Amino acid sequence: MPQIVIAALYKFVSLPDFEALREPLQAFCIENEIKGTLLLAQEGINGTVAGRREAIDALLAYFGKDARLADIDHKESYEEEQPFYRMKVKLKKEIVTMGVEGIDPNNIVGTYVEPKDWNSLIDDPEVIVVDTRNNYEYDIGTFEGALNPNTESFRELPEYVAKNLDPAKHKKVAMFCTGGIRCEKSTAFMKQRGFEEVYHLKGGILKYLEEVPEEQTRWKGECFVFDNRVAVNHALEKGTYDLCHGCRYPITEEDKKSEKYIEGVACPHCHDTQTPDQRARFMERQKQVQLAKARKQAHIGAPAPSRQK
């Protein structure tokens, strides 16, 4: 029976005192042996953490004492082992970085679509479906018929919209992401740019996989997640991908058979682009990981997925 609860959570809400929230939140999580990363900004909170059931319940109760965070959106999955190495609470300009001034999902946002209604929406031939995630996420799984903006970071999405989508031509646009935060900000951006009918999947892919039976799914593949599981399948169990710790790209068993794969160092995606200094640094890091593993200790510097959510 899984012992660890993994909670992905976020909320867009005005937090003018966000800097003062950091230290008490960090201390609470450490005291309760919760690990992961939380981002605080004036626009809200975002992150993924993991701990025992009672610890995560205590964290939700902690948020509940602040009226602004009492109804924080959170989704859970479960694992046998802690997927994170440490606890970090970071201060940021944005909780998900788009880099466009004046976007505020607290004031304007697209229409939320419940997971049970998502299939009907994306089956509509008039609806353009846009995956707001990045290439490495799209490559391992997405919804049937979804457009890939071919982005390497969320910052590139506005440029994709400017070049490829037109409010006068694309009357209905549906957007989705892993947990809901990127598509919420994306639809706020779209509304600001004059798109009228803009929809986004409430709770993101993870909520869809949780609530929609696999026999009814429009999802194809696995879903990239930002912890050491790398990806999850439709049952929200650890999928078949591992992570290249050189470039943070998800890799398959086939990739590992390549002559360009070096465990913990490089893979076919990054082998030919690494500098000698990078290669040496990654080799030394992997050596330390192996030494820690031999001593049955967690290597505190062991890399975990850190790409933009």
From Swiss-Prot:
Which example biological process does GO assign this protein?
A: tRNA modification
- Spell out the molecular function terms from Gene Ontology: oxidoreductase activity, acting on paired donors, with incorporation or reduction of molecular oxygen
Keyword annotations of the record: Oxidoreductase, tRNA processing
Keyword tRNA processing listed: yes
What reaction(s) does this enzyme catalyze?
uridine(34) in tRNA + AH2 + O2 = 5-hydroxyuridine(34) in tRNA + A + H2O
Which EC number(s) does UniProt give?
Answer: 1.14.-.-
EC main group:
oxidoreductase
The family database entries (InterPro entries) matched by this protein are listed as: Rhodanese-like_dom, Rhodanese-like_dom_sf, TrhO, TRHO_N
User: According to its UniProt record, which residues of this chain constitute the active site?
Assistant: 177
| Domain annotation Rhodanese: ranges | 123-217
Instruction: Name a Pfam family for this protein.
Output: UPF0176_N
Q: Which family does it belong to?
A: Belongs to the TrhO family.
- What the protein does? Catalyzes oxygen-dependent 5-hydroxyuridine (ho5U) modification at position 34 in tRNAs.
Q: What is this protein called?
A: tRNA uridine(34) hydroxylase
Give the source species. Answer: Saccharophagus degradans (strain 2-40 / ATCC 43961 / DSM 17024)
